[in-house]
Amino acid sequence: MAKKSMIIKQKRTPKFKVRAYTRCERCGRPHSVYRKFKLCRICFRELAYKGQLPGIKKASW
């Protein structure tokens, strides 16, 4: 779980556009965030296994 101060800091508009970065909307993790879902890899995996992400299924071949 991310620190609340960092989540609040990230929500402010940065002085320069290149300083903007993505965070997981569920836990606030700044790394490994899928832009399409706005989730980090860990939250994405949990929700996919529970079947809460429509159109996502485990690959098998």
Swiss-Prot record:
Residues reported in the UniProt entry to bind Zn(2+): 24, 27, 40, 43
Entry keyword annotation includes Transcription regulation: no
Keywords: Metal-binding, Ribonucleoprotein, Ribosomal protein, RNA-binding, rRNA-binding, Zinc
Cofactor binding mode and count: Binds 1 zinc ion per subunit.
Span of the signal peptide: none
Domain of life from the UniProt record: Bacteria
GO process annotations (BP): translation
Named cofactor requirement(s): Zn(2+)
One Pfam family hit: Ribosomal_S14
Gene Ontology MF: a single term: structural constituent of ribosome
InterPro entries named among the record's database cross-references: Ribosomal_uS14, Ribosomal_uS14_bact, Ribosomal_uS14_CS, Ribosomal_uS14_sf
Self-association state and partner proteins as the record states: Part of the 30S ribosomal subunit. Contacts proteins S3 and S10.
NCBIfam families assigned: PRK08061.1
Function noted in UniProt: Binds 16S rRNA, required for the assembly of 30S particles and may also be responsible for determining the conformation of the 16S rRNA at the A site.
Protein name, UniProt field: Small ribosomal subunit protein uS14
Organism: Geobacillus stearothermophilus
Gene this protein is translated from: rpsZ
